[in-house]
Amino acid sequence: MAYQIECLETRVEEDQGQYGQFALHPLAPGQGITVGNALRRVLLSNLPGSAVTAVRIAGVNHEFSTIPGVREDVMDILLQMKQLVIRSHTSEPQMGRLFAQAPENEPLTVTAGMVQLGSEVEVVNPNHYIATLMPGATLEMEFKIEKDRGYRSVERVRDDRLALDYLQLDAVFMPVRRVNYTVDSVRSAGAEGDRQLQDYLKLEIWTNGSLTPQDALNQAATILVDLFSPLKEVPLHTSEATATDDHDETGQIPIEQLNLSVRAYNCLKRAQVNTVADLLEYSQEELLEIKNFGQKSAEEVIEALQKHLGITLPPQKAARN
């Protein structure tokens, strides 16, 4: 039986962020956590979003400057610009501009709604505060908007093509601010009337307003489908010769390369275990049968094989007919 998706609640927050609550049910036991965790990770890290990545302010050369007639210093203004919520309808970088001049007789509050943007870009939170200008003061700036995923620090990606007076910013492109999910076990009627235990997944999504929770969920689901679709047609080509060669090559590795302790090494040597191939003749249970070979030494060998070669010894002796 296919599960259903219900939208339980949606609302727009005071800061123009959006909230949505969804239910997915019925799911087989265990699938609630699988689906919820996968969606949560993709929602938080894989959805594209837009952000201000660089700002140039007239008369300012570095972020520790002050601007005459402006209450905030440059660092405060940059922090406010980072919190601008942008909806971009293009993947190309865009430029925005702001020119504000306070009247001679009163201060002026500068908000995001005063910025000038191209037709491909819009501000989602126009009431967002940027700065306060004293009477007669002027604030002029231009800024770069980019579209990307996740978080990008200036130290990791610095654009050397920008003019020197551009102040580059750490950018948060993630349009989804927060995701929460809960899984409840509920009983539903089965095919023969019996009450079967099912998972009921409740998913909560908070976005910055640049996209709706419904769109965010749709994009996340599409990403996961695209990620797993190729697995339906994976060609399973096996090469016995290659597999045998790899096994033989691994088997010839001397046990010295496992970096074992002196005690474990000497015990193996006395038991005529000289190579990995010799060691693979033993199960974890059989290692303990080697003279003077204790539990600690066995755990050391098992860990060394896994760490250096990715090999796991079988826990017990193989059954023989």
Curated annotation (Swiss-Prot):
Quote the entry's note on domains. Answer: The N-terminal domain is essential for RNAP assembly and basal transcription, whereas the C-terminal domain is involved in interaction with transcriptional regulators and with upstream promoter elements.
What is one cellular component GO term in this UniProt entry? DNA-directed RNA polymerase complex
Alphabetical keyword list: DNA-directed RNA polymerase, Nucleotidyltransferase, Transcription, Transferase
In its UniProt record, which GO terms are filed under biological process?
Answer: DNA-templated transcription
Segments of this protein annotated with the region Alpha N-terminal domain (alpha-NTD)? 1-235
- Name the chain's protein: DNA-directed RNA polymerase subunit alpha
Q: Which reaction does it catalyse?
A: RNA(n) + a ribonucleoside 5'-triphosphate = RNA(n+1) + diphosphate
The ranges of region (Alpha C-terminal domain (alpha-CTD)) come to 252-321
What Enzyme Commission number does this protein have? 2.7.7.6
**What family does the database annotate?**
Belongs to the RNA polymerase alpha chain family.
Q: What is the protein's known function?
A: DNA-dependent RNA polymerase catalyzes the transcription of DNA into RNA using the four ribonucleoside triphosphates as substrates.
Question: Recorded GO terms, molecular function?
Answer: DNA binding; DNA-directed RNA polymerase activity; protein dimerization activity
- Spell out the InterPro entries in the cross-references: DNA-dir_RNA_pol_insert, DNA-dir_RNA_pol_RpoA/D/Rpb3, DNA-dir_RpoA, RBP11-like, RNAP_asu_C, RNApol_insert_sf
Entries under Pfam families matching the protein:
RNA_pol_A_bac, RNA_pol_A_CTD, RNA_pol_L
- Note the NCBIfam families from the entry: PRK05182.2-2 (NF003516), PRK05182.2-5 (NF003519), rpoA (TIGR02027)
Give the gene name: rpoA
- Tell me the subunit arrangement: Homodimer. In cyanobacteria the RNAP catalytic core is composed of 2 alpha, 1 beta, 1 beta', 1 gamma and 1 omega subunit. When a sigma factor is associated with the core the holoenzyme is formed, which can initiate transcription.
The main enzyme category here is transferase
